[in-house]
């Protein structure tokens, strides 16, 4: 839910062009910019489609939303998911910083690609 600092979504490919690499909690997915006060519907639909897909296969899995320590973008996104009826959503306030400070490993990640069909329909 971090911003794609210095980066942008290439709407021709659905991929993000980043200015710097990003580390996160192993096994996590990155959906940049989905916690903004006003979120791009294209980005939000990419996130919710992925949540729906995970829930079809694993209906009891929690959805844990995080960013950096005390990042309000992740709080916004977790609240939006819960208000949209997604159950078992949690905000991990300590985020990547807290995970790393606890001595846990991080891994490099790239943002989730926006499906081209959605990009073309949003143009």
Language-model features, listed with the residues they occupy:
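Cytosolic catalytic domains that perform sulfur/thiol-centered chemistry
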Residues: 1-93, 101-123
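Conserved Rossmann-like nucleotide-cofactor binding loop
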Residues: 97
